[in-house]
């Protein structure tokens, strides 16, 4: 089942995926990740299952380090345990604020945890902020690897200003 289509990505982002070890046929066993995360209370959904089977374990370097309003100088690492172990309360907060069912898939800037929602939305969260990576998994790859649009802060905890500001110029 193809719940997303990586062929829709820009050639540069596809090249970064390939350089990280991805191939169109790639499907790996994800049981070793899913069992400990389910033990913490996460519920695997079909999109998260496909994301992890297709790109789990990969670390993808950015192709553009200067986003419109953020420095994109860290890789997108698909390690669901690093993103999710001990972070179930964070996922529950995201679910309460945004609705939906979120499953951890990896880490991005400043080790923020990346979660994919059953309906497709991808967010990153950490340090009191929640950011929109994309309405689809493909959009999240374009942003996190290609820095092709501004990073949008969806939520800031009390006492924090949204980051990055929409008028911030990076790099």
Language model features with spans:
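Long, charged low-complexity regulatory segments
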Residues: 157-168
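N-terminal functional modules and adjacent low-complexity/disordered segments of proteins
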Residues: 12, 73, 85, 89, ...
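Short acidic-glycine loop/turn motifs at beta-strand connectors
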Residues: 116-120
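Short, solvent-exposed loop/turn segments at secondary-structure junctions
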Residues: 109-111, 121, 129-130, 159
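Broad hydrophobic/π-residue packing in well-ordered secondary structure
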Residues: 48-52, 123, 140
């Amino acid at each position: 089942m193809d719940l997303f289509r990586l062929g829709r990505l820009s050639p540069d982002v596809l090249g970064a995926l390939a350089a990280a070890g991805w191939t169109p046929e790639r499907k790996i066993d994800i049981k070793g990740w899913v069992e400990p995360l389910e033990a913490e209370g996460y519920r695997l959904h079909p999109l998260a299952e496909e994301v992890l089977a297709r790109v789990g374990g990969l670390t993808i370097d950015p192709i553009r380090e200067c986003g419109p309003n953020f420095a994109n100088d860290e890789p997108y690492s698909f390690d669901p345990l690093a993103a999710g172990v001990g972070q179930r309360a964070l996922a529950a907060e995201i679910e309460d604020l945004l609705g939906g069912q979120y499953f951890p898939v990896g880490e991005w800037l400043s080790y923020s945890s990346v979660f994919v929602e059953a309906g497709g939305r991808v967010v990153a969260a950490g340090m009191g902020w929640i950011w929109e990576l994309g309405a689809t998994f493909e959009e999240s790859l374009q942003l996190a690897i290609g820095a092709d649009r501004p990073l949008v802060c969806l939520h800031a905890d009390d006492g924090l200003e949204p980051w990055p500001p929409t008028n911030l110029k990076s790099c």
